[in-house]
């Protein structure tokens, strides 16, 4: 779908660079049968997944000559948009013109598998892009720790080049991140409870403490553990704002705190 391949012949010829697993023609034919049946079911239900919806919207704009609906389009968190999304935005903006599309993105913050090469989506940024090197949100200690984890990993610049992250710096400072290791979940929960009490004793309110986990299962374990210790918690969910009138430790998945 990222390559907007919607027929069997094109699918068998579509490149799979970077996908990891090689598929010969026989396997591709078998996979196509599954995808074709999926498309038939979606058509019967008059439903579309996001990628197909964006593709069909763009085709409607192009076929009815409705492109160029907006003078300027601004994109934030551009690293998370798919090729289909960028092609749709290109159609909405129309032919290339001054200040047509402004994109802000950071591939280091990409948490979805969407990866678009802007030049292949009709968006020319070569010689027109700028790097923002000053971080006003994260402390220098956290920034160094994060880039240390990413050492040796290559990141794209949202086009056909790479961003090595060199030259970035933060203007604020704070404590160095600590790494704690635990043999069991119970040990981890005991530490969390004691750490929360330490922070409270130093004057930090519970609602200014946030526990972040990779999965919802881990969140459920943390919520149950805090409840047993008599500590209130407030889970930050999708489409639900953080109610600051409610006391309690904030708890969320890594997806929910993205951008904070």
Positions of PLM-derived features:
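P-loop NTPase catalytic cores that bind/hydrolyze ATP
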Residues: 1-4, 32, 36
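Short coil/turn segments at secondary-structure boundaries
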Residues: 7-14, 45-55
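Conserved helicase motor core of SF1/SF2 NTP-dependent helicases
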Residues: 24-27, 33-47, 59-260
